[in-house]
Amino acid sequence: LVNTSSIFGIITTPNNTVYHASKFAVRGFTESLIKEMEGSNTQIHCVYPGHIGTNIAINAKFGDQIVKGENKDGILGLDGEPIKDLKGEKVSEEEAGVRFRDAGMDPDKAAKIILRGIKKNKKRIFVGIDSKLMELSQRLFPDSYLKIMPITLFLGLLFSPHRLKKVINLAIKKKA
């Protein structure tokens, strides 16, 4: 049995209470089930993916909690200001979703990591260096991990040079 939570079942960010509650519920359910099924032949795993290159940001229906909306100035961030790329150009909601997807780990690679974790009978399967680093920062700094999250994410990119290159290319990519 493989249940998928998220790194957001380990850490929390402001204004995402319902999402975190659902991911923590999957985590709690799975960890409890692992204890209940000890001694049986049933393998139970909980997957904690980090940033995987899926269409979640394109297909998601964002509310005011995540994005304040889109107007003639482009997609607005939490501060109410338009989100811009490294060239200072405004980014649409669709373009932001595409860039988010394209900067993530290849889903096939994520699947291989999950299958390897299942074969090794790992109860917790963290997918991606970002997921592992965020989980570690939460354990080491439970009250202040959000303050160091930018550093954690940057370190994740440094340990994954191909993703760092993708992120830089996407950040400076000119909209066609």
Task: Indicate residue ranges for each PLM-predicted region.
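Rossmann-fold scaffold of SDR-type NAD(P)-dependent oxidoreductases
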Residues: 3
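Active-site helix of classical SDR
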Residues: 22
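Active-site loop immediately N-terminal to the catalytic Tyr-X3-Lys motif
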Residues: 11-18
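Residue(s) in the substrate-gating loop at a strand-loop-helix junction
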Residues: 6
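Catalytic tyrosine of NAD(P)H-dependent dehydrogenase/reductases that use a Tyr as the general acid/base
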Residues: 19, 27
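Active-site-adjacent segment of SDR/Rossmann-fold oxidoreductases
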Residues: 11, 32-42
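A transmembrane-helix-recognition feature enriched in membrane-embedded lipid enzymes
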Residues: 122-158, 163
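SDR active-site lid
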Residues: 39-129
